Amino acid sequence: MATVTLTSCAGVDDNKIEDNPNIIFILADDLGYADISCLGQNKFSTPNIDKLASQGMVFTQHYSGSSVSAPSRSWLITGQHTGHTVIRGNKGLPVEGQHPMPSDTYTIFKMLKDNGYKTSVFGKWGLGAPQTEGAPENQSV
C-alpha cells in the first residue's frame, strides 16, 4: 500500500507564502532502497518517480519508526518518537483496525496548513476509521 501526500501553495494568501516549494511525499510499505530505477533498480523502470526525483530532492537516509504500519505513520506525521505517539501497534479492531488518533494531535498537516499550504492524502490512512476523530478530514488533511 502506498500513501502519497501532496501539498501545494497554489491559491493561498500571497502575503503569507512566497516561493515555498510544492511537496510530494511518497510512502510505500516495504519499498526498499533500490526498488526504484533512479536508485539502481534495473529489472524494471519507474519513469514517473524517476522524473519527480530528477526535478526535486531525494532523501535516502529515512527509516521506519516502527516495524508495523500504523505506528510508523503516526510517528511520521506527528514527529513523535513511537514511544510517545498514541498509536503504538496495529490493532485487530473492526473497519480500519486502529484506535483513532485524537483530533487535537499536532501533525505535519496542521503545521503545513498553518504556513499556507493545502494538503491531501491518497491511499492507506490507517490512523482512524471513517467518522472517527482519527479520520483524515478530522486531522486537517
Residue ranges and their predicted role:
Residues M1-T3, T7-V141:
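Formylglycine-dependent sulfatase
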